A protein has these predicted regions:
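Short active-site loop at a secondary-structure junction
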Residues: 6-14, 36-95, 126-139, 213-216
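Residue-level preference for non-acidic, small/hydrophobic
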Residues: 15, 21, 54-57, 61, ...
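Short, well-ordered beta-strand elements
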Residues: 296-297, 303-312
Length: 338
């Protein structure tokens, strides 16, 4: 399946499968871009993981809750005084993590070229009252990045997030790759605004923020993305985890839903339309996707995580949901021996 998609849907891919916290399968495919110069993709190649950034940042937020720096259900006006006396003052960390805060889904980057994106995210009128319904939002997680930075002042947002993730075991996950690293990172899209994008964040809002944001911007390996899933699997299966076990378990049960979406705290949960996790993973499955062509799906019933990293926007913005689902189903069949 992945061989068939190389050269038409993406130029590079890595699949990693872990079960019980142990590596069961890992393979890299393709090259970093379709045109020369390019280099081969390896298992430890770093990809722009796009919105999987949200789940890494959510893990840091939960760690802040465990450490007493934040609270899930308290209002946030002490850290975000811009929200006092506005509908935003009813926003809580739980509502941000579950996409229940009422933020608009996003904004066309062309409307933000002359704006401070962080200030825009904090002050743009809400699309719904906090707590009313699920509305998946980049703006909410841009605000979350600001909240985390203000909760522990004195360090840059990037430095704080990167150091925390490294301490938790995601040692290759970081913002803004160095220039020497960029040719080794799979290229994303070529567009009229920025030209060929390689080694810089694809997401336009994160790019306008200097490459560092709570909703996108991290680059990471398949191993680190699988490690993220393992922090939560370990809590569910009573193994050591860098997260507070009770909070990790709470994060992967439903905190909000609508007719299509089910959300945990940072995570998407399997729905009746199967998301992109296929038909065979258990109903308790949780995961997340990234617009660049990345995904992780975690099946607690099988103690299984499936990571697929690609640069699917390299040839355009076509939907790779069938490929993601096909990979997940193939892994489950192999693990189940069917």
């Amino acid at each position: 399946m992945l061989h068939d998609a190389l050269g038409t849907r993406f130029s590079a891919a890595v699949v990693r499968v872990e079960q019980g916290g142990r590596l069961r399968y890992e393979r890299a495919f393709g090259r970093t871009r379709s045109a020369e110069p390019s280099v081969p993709c390896f298992p430890d190649t770093r990809f722009d993981i796009a919105s999987i950034t949200k789940v890494f940042v959510s893990a840091i937020a939960l760690d802040d809750v465990a450490g007493g720096r934040l609270a899930l259900d308290a209002t946030l006006t002490d850290l975000v005084p811009e929200w006092r006396g506005t509908p935003h003052e009813d926003i809580t960390l739980r509502r941000i993590l579950a996409h229940l805060a009422g933020f608009k889904s996003g904004a066309d980057y062309r409307t933000l070229l002359d704006k401070n994106v962080e200030a825009f995210a904090l002050t743009e009128p809400l699309a719904a009252p906090p707590g009313a319904h699920v509305l998946y939002s980049d703006l909410g997680f841009i605000a979350l990045g600001t909240i985390l930075a203000r909760a522990t002042p004195g360090r840059s947002a990037a430095g704080r997030i990167e150091s925390r993730l490294a301490a938790m075991g995601a040692t290759s996950t970081a913002y803004r790759p160095r220039g020497i690293e960029r040719p080794t990172i799979p290229a994303t899209e070529t567009d009229a605004w920025r030209g060929a994008v390689q080694g810089e964040v694809h997401d336009e809002k994160a790019y306008l923020m200097g490459g560092v944001a709570g909703h996108a911007g991290l680059f990471g390996t398949a191993r680190d993305v699988a490690e993220l899933g393992n922090w939560y699997l370990a809590a569910l299966h009573r193994r050591p985890t860098p997260l507070d076990p009770a909070l990790a378990r709470e994060a992967v049960v439903e905190a909000g839903h609508d007719d299509v979406l089910r959300r945990g705290l940072g995570w998407a949960l399997k729905t009746s339309d199967e998301n992109s996790c296929g038909a065979l993973m258990s109903p308790s499955t949780f995961g997340h996707t990234g617009f660049t062509g990345t995904s992780i799906w975690v099946d607690p019933a099988r103690d299984l995580s499936v990571v697929l990293l690609t640069n699917a926007v390299h040839f355009g913005r076509s939907d790779i949901r069938p490929i993601r689902a096909g990979v997940a189903d193939a892994v489950v069949r192999a693990m189940d021996g069917t």
